[in-house]
Design a protein with these regions (language model features):
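Dinucleotide-binding Rossmann-like beta1-alpha1 core, especially the glycine-rich loop
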Residues: 48-148, 280-281
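Glycine-rich phosphate/pyrophosphate-binding beta-alpha loops
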Residues: 56, 168-170, 278-280, 355-359, ...
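Core beta-strand elements of the Rossmann-like FAD/NAD(P) dinucleotide-binding domain
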Residues: 3-5, 212-222
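Flavin (FAD/FMN) cofactor-binding and adjacent substrate-gating region
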Residues: 100-187, 192-193, 199-206
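Glycine-rich FAD pyrophosphate-binding loop
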Residues: 24-44
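Active-site substrate-recognition segment that forms the wall
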Residues: 21-25, 49-51, 79-92, 206, ...
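Beta1/beta-strand and adjacent pyrophosphate-binding region of the FAD-binding site
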Residues: 2-15, 31
Length: 445
């Protein structure tokens, strides 16, 4: 007889684990299934783990700011669980959003005011006082180093910054997922690893379980797709699900670089997470007194959509899928060096390359599906790490409401943010929404 659970969650990353945690707290018997060896070992491990409040929509800002409470009180969120690997640490550096043409910062400020986000306005003198290595000239528009105008001397200055003192980053994204797994296990959740899903089984349009690559069948009336870059492949296994979604997901190859801090500047101790739309990058401190430099997907940067199976099997045409490219290394580090006076750029690239699971408008899908009992928390890569605990609770409550008879498509589940007290219309994350043109269509969400 097949093993039976109340809910099977495909994926044990930083969103899959919180969903299990919250469902088990509701009394459901859950099983997370992951093809890798441990929690958080997929795209979560390559996350920059940044915690910031700025998003392009008010609901996005509200959910992100709600999430701050969990990161700032990490041990409390975990129920003071013990983890043999230790606990990830929240690095509360504060978060700088530079006022630039690359960010609609006025809209962000309006959202901050509406939601009640704590922030300060910094003028250029204040920025220079807090981060003396920043050159505050305007370099807009974003260019690539091969552009003949890249090294032109700037003549204008930025307008200032919005500073959010509660922002920062988690010290170890994979460990944070592992911590949540241990918290979920303490409530009764189960996890299996090195287990690849090859079939979503259903009967009369009701999900009944999954089949693993080794032939094992596991049954549950609820299956949740939280498979990260493989999410669209899991949806294709569920009869009618992929085709019915108006918003689809796909995998985007993305590179993040590490660059030494300028000599004499302790960026690890004194630095801030910074979103810099003026140069199309974001950066934060990293161990070894490094700048971790990510791309904000400016228009001049090519986007490479890939098959995740080929990427992880190192079968993409230019060689190893996770190999940094010299072209993008130069683009991100040279841009950052224009902002950071004295930045040291090594000859050999150093960093991380992995995949984002992106929706058509870079806003995630947190929703039910055309198949009864089959749910999705997908399209979340690049900008949802910071929302993971909130997303876990929202998905658990949405699933619970739907299983009790709510027609979520007709009347979207109203999710109340416990700390802010605001109610979110979860139809915002619907699979059947039209593309949201308020989105930044980038990692900024």
């Amino acid at each position: 007889m097949n093993k039976q659970y109340d809910a099977i969650i495909i994926g044990a990353g930083v969103i899959g684990c919180p969903i299990a945690y919250e469902l088990t707290k509701m009394g459901r018997k859950t099983l997370n299934v992951d093809k890798l060896a441990d929690a958080g070992e997929g795209s979560t491990a390559a996350s920059c783990a940044i915690v910031r409040a700025h998003y392009s929509t008010e609901d996005g800002v509200a959910i992100a700011y709600e999430g701050f409470k969990y990161w700032l009180e990490w041990e409390k969120y975990l129920g003071y669980v013990k983890d043999e690997k230790g606990l990830a640490k929240y690095m509360n550096t504060g978060s700088i959003l530079l006022k630039s043409q690359g960010h609609d910062w006025r809209k962000v400020q309006k959202h901050y005011d509406a939601v009640g986000v704590r922030y300060e306005e910094w003028d250029l003198n204040k920025i220079k006082e807090m981060v003396p290595v920043y050159d505050l000239h305007e370099f807009w528009p974003v260019k690539r180093p091969e552009d003949p105008e890249f090294f032109n001397e700037p003549t204008r200055f930025l307008e200032g910054a919005l500073f959010c003192p509660e922002g920062g980053y988690m010290s170890d994204p994979a460990l944070s997922a592992h911590n949540i797994m241990r918290a979920a296990e303490a409530k009764g959740a189960e996890f299996i690893f090195n287990a690849e899903v090859v079939e979503i089984r259903s009967r009369d349009n009701q999900v009944v379980g999954i089949t693993l690559k080794d032939g094992t069948q596991i049954d549950a009336p609820i299956v949740v797709n939280v498979a990260g870059p493989h999410s669209y492949k899991i949806n294709q296994m569920a009869a009618g699900v992929f085709e019915e979604c108006n918003i689809k997901t796909k995998a985007l190859r993305h590179e993040v670089m590490y660059c030494p801090s300028p000599q004499g500047y302790d960026y690890l101790k004194d630095g801030y997470h910074t979103s810099d739309g003026d140069i199309g990058c974001y950066y934060r401190p990293e161990v070894g007194n490094m700048f971790l430099i990510g791309s904000e997907d400016p228009e001049c940067d090519p986007q490479e959509w890939v098959d995740p199976d080929l990427f992880y099997a190192a079968q993409l045409p230019y060689g190893r899928g996770n190999e940094l490219t010299m072209e993008q290394w130069r683009a991100q580090t040279y841009r950052c060096a224009r902002r950071v006076t004295g930045m040291q750029i090594p000859n050999q690239p150093r960093g991380v390359c992995d995949l984002y699971d992106c929706s058509d408008d870079w806003i995630p899908i947190y929703d039910k599906s055309a198949m009864k009992g089959f749910y999705m928390a997908i399209g979340s890569s690049g900008n949802q790490y910071k929302n993971a605990p909130v997303a876990g609770l929202m998905m658990a409550e949405l699933i619970d409401a739907c299983e009790k008879g709510l027609d979520h498509d007709k009347t979207p589940f109203p999710f109340k943010l416990p700390h802010l007290g605001r109610t979110i219309d979860t139809g915002f994350f619907s699979r059947n929404r039209e593309i949201n043109y308020d989105s930044s269509f980038s990692v900024n969400g």
